[in-house]
């Protein structure tokens, strides 16, 4: 039998990083709730209508610092934070499929997770015939954050 030389190449890989913050999330929750009605957009069909202003504060600074440190340790890359906001789901709310195409890295940090909270689902566009073929879902956990490529479609 003739031996054949075969090589395999990985042409698609998407990394998602999971970490945990040590920040005072109860205090951050109060800051976010106090700004709940201070929307990033007043236009109801704008995706930013669901998002609230999160004023600069030491708790967010700590979380961002932890994320930057963890990302650097995992990738040896430096990050610069462009912006952040609050996103509060009331009971039975969801977020439509979207991405942050203009960001190199995006992140979400769970400040509080009531019973019955929805999973975050990441859906890469790797199969043109089945958009959910490579979907991955993660249960929300208080204090946990996920960092992922800005182009990665996701929803709750």
Task: Report the location of each language-model feature.
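Non-heme Fe(II)/2-oxoglutarate
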Residues: 1-77
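Catalytic core of non-heme Fe(II) oxygenases with the double-stranded beta-helix
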Residues: 80-147, 151, 155
